[in-house]
Amino acid sequence: EKLNWIDENYLSHFEKIEVDSEVRLQKPFAERKEEYGFYSVTEGEDTEGKAYFSYNTVCGDGLDRNLYRAFPVLSYVLVQSIGAPLKQALLDAGIGNDISCYYEESVRQPFFSIIAKNVKMEQKQQFINVIETELKKIVKEGLNQQSLLAAINGYEFQYREADFGNFPKGLMYGLQIFDSWLYD
C-alpha cells in the first residue's frame, strides 16, 4: 500500500533512465610511477633514516573469487609471518627496521603494498631491487610449503570462527558481500 502511494505520488512522474555505473579497470602504467609525500616530525628532530618506502602493485580483478581468498594467504606467507621471505630479505639488506604489507581487496582493482619504515632515502633503488629479486627467486624456487600450509590453516580457522571482534557477524558478512556487489 505504501509503495503504491509512493509510486502514484512521486515515482510515476519520472522517466526511467539508464545509468552506466560500471567501474572500469584502469589501464596499466607504461612505466613505474613514483610519488613523494611528507609527514610531520617534531621541531629539530633528525630526519635521517626516517623515510617510508612503499612498493605497490595491482593484483588482478576484484571480481576474481580465487584471488580474493588466495592473496591474503600469500601476503601472510610473503611478508607477515615470522621469517617471511620478502620481509627477511629487506631486513637482511638493512632496509628499514619494520616491514609490513597491505592488501586491499574491496576495490575493483585490488592492490598489494610492501612497506618499509625508517629507511634512508638513498636506499630507494636497493628497496626495489631486493623486492623484485626475491619475488623472482620465489617464483623460481617456490614458497615454503610448511609456511603456506600454516597460512591456509590459519585463514580457514579464521573464516570458520567468523570472529570479527566487536563487530556483529551479520554486518561484517554484509560488508564483505559489497566487495563484489558494488561492481557491474
Each model region followed by its residue ranges:
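Charge-rich, well-structured scaffold segments of protease-associated domains
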Residues: 1-36, 43-71, 76-184
